[in-house]
Amino acid sequence: MARMGLAGAAGRWWGLALGLTAFFLPGTHTQVVQVNDSMYGFIGTDVVLHCSFANPLPSVKITQVTWQKASNGSKQNMAIYNPTMGVSVLPPYEKRVEFLRPSFIDGTIRLSGLELEDEGMYICEFATFPTGNRESQLNLTVMAKPTNWIEGTRAVLRARKGQDDKVLVATCTSANGKPPSAVSWETRLKGEAEYQEIRNPNGTVTVISRYRLVPSREAHRQSLACIVNYHLDRFRESLTLNVQYEPEVTIEGFDGNWYLQRTDVKLTCKADANPPATEYHWTTLNGSLPKGVEAQNRTLFFRGPITYSLAGTYICEATNPIGTRSGQVEVNITEFPYTPTPEHGRRAGQMPTAIIGGVAGSVLLVLIVVGGIIVALRRRRHTFKGDYSTKKHVYGNGYSKAGIPQHHPPMAQNLQYPDDSDDEKKAGPLGGSSYEEEEEEEGGGGGERKVGGPHPKYDEDAKRPYFTVDEAEARQDGYGDRTLGYQYDPEQLDLAENMVSQNDGSFISKKEWYV
């Protein structure tokens, strides 16, 4: 009804707009009959058909308002309003049609108790003088809400081994709808649906959907819902399937820890069946039950302490009206009880161990890397820079105090190297030396020695901190009876040849040198 009212309001505004357009546009002084283009209503409800007349010419006189229905190319009068004769409603509408506000400009009527036969084209006509009749048409659609329901099959659904044929399990019906409904199914079942439409003589449509599937134990107690969508309405109704099937048998009670002298143990036969199992039968794979074992319906009791004789395969057969099925369990007997460690306990114990192991491994890896770096730096610092040539060992510059043993001079911060060395450079002190040098005065003194600064004669030699063995021997012959820092001694030479100079100023034996 709210939607019909909204459509009617839209029609009135549309008609008013047309009337104003006809009135204000130059040259358009035609009379306009305003109606809704289309209307709809449901069977049994009321519908209002709007009609009004826009008369831009005051000189035009309205004499009558008439409602007609088009039927098979002809017009059938329904209701008439005449200012002189009043309102007249013709059969079969005399009890169903009324003018709401009868006047020269408003011919709106109400049609009550809609029937399917009311659907069609309606005409609103205004008789005017002297311009003649003016009319407009509207289309009325009558809708029928369907009746919906779902029903399960009356046949008994039975699941049988090897069955492949689908059977009807439910039917969903949406009857006497106009227009027809949309029917669907909502379920987890793996079936299929088929649809059928039946057009009734009165113009309505009945939609029927049938759902089929292969009966199975899994389909038992599953929900099957029928969904009907019609216009703005949604219908949903469901049912629960009842499928009969043979027993599905399992045996409970054996926990894998049956040991000698254990007591109070039993086996229970569980049968999933529809209808429920009514009979249980216990046996063993060898035939009869062992001594001390007693069957009571679906329970098997073990009397007394457990012995090795109770080991074996136990079978339970369950029977219902559909059939008989069996299940079995193998019982093993151990000498001593077994207490398994809970899974969560093992996991909890493993977690700290894994964490500690990871941390320890990381620390060890860091220590190894740091140690490797330190060792590499030490080796690089003490790497041997000399050579094993016996011709170029370091002995000093050949100058020292007479009678004072030669000492290795300290290293200077700034270093220079001999120009005549073609091998790797050997470091030596820069500048002059602090050694005492002697000089003979020319022309007097008879060999008198003076102690003072270095003689110019020795400046060049003093700048050379090192000499080779050959150079040292030559210089010894040249200086005669001068006192040299180097005294040729085969034992000392042998000792010197076995010594190696290091960058930090120390000497080590070749026999002890290593990298």
Curated annotation (Swiss-Prot):
Residues 31-141 form the Ig-like V-type domain. Disruption phenotype: Mice are viable and fertile but display microphthalmia. Microphthalmia is accompanied by a separation of the apex-apex contact between the pigment and non-pigment cell layers of the ciliary epithelia. Mice also show abnormal incisor teeth, due to hypomineralized enamel. In the auditory epithelium, impaired formation of the checkerboard-like cellular pattern of hair cells and supporting cells, due to aberrant attachment between hair cells. Residues 145-243, 247-334 form the Ig-like C2-type domain. SMART domains: IG, IGc2, IGv. Residues 1-30 form the signal peptide. Glycans are attached at N36, N72, N139, N202, N286, N297, N332. Residues 399-486 are annotated as: Disordered. Disulfide bonds join C51-C124, C172-C226, C269-C316. Residues 447-464 have a biased composition (Basic and acidic residues). PROSITE patterns: IG_LIKE (PS50835). GO terms for biological process: axon guidance; camera-type eye morphogenesis; cell-cell adhesion; cochlea morphogenesis; desmosome organization; enamel mineralization; heterophilic cell-cell adhesion via plasma membrane cell adhesion molecules; homophilic cell adhesion via plasma membrane adhesion molecules. The modification Phosphoserine is found at S421, S433, S434, S509. Changing F129A: Abolished binding to pseudorabies virus glycoprotein D; knockin mice are resistant infection by pseudorabies virus. Residues 282-299 are annotated as: Interaction with FGFR. Cis- and trans-homodimer. Can form trans-heterodimers with NECTIN3 and with NECTIN4. Interaction between NECTIN1 and NECTIN3 on the pre- and postsynaptic sites, respectively, initiates the formation of puncta adherentia junctions between axons and dendrites. Interacts (via cytoplasmic domain) with AFDN (via PDZ domain); this interaction recruits NECTIN1 to cadherin-based adherens junctions and provides a connection with the actin cytoskeleton. Interacts with integrin alphaV/beta3. Interacts (via Ig-like C2-type domain 2) with FGFR1, FGFR2 and FGFR3. (Microbial infection) Interacts with herpes pseudorabies virus/PRV envelope glycoprotein D. The Ig-like V-type domain is involved in homophilic interaction in cis, a prerequisite for cell adhesion. Ig-like C2-type 2 mediates neurite outgrowth through binding, induction of phosphorylation, and activation of FGFR. This is Nectin-1. The gene is Nectin1.
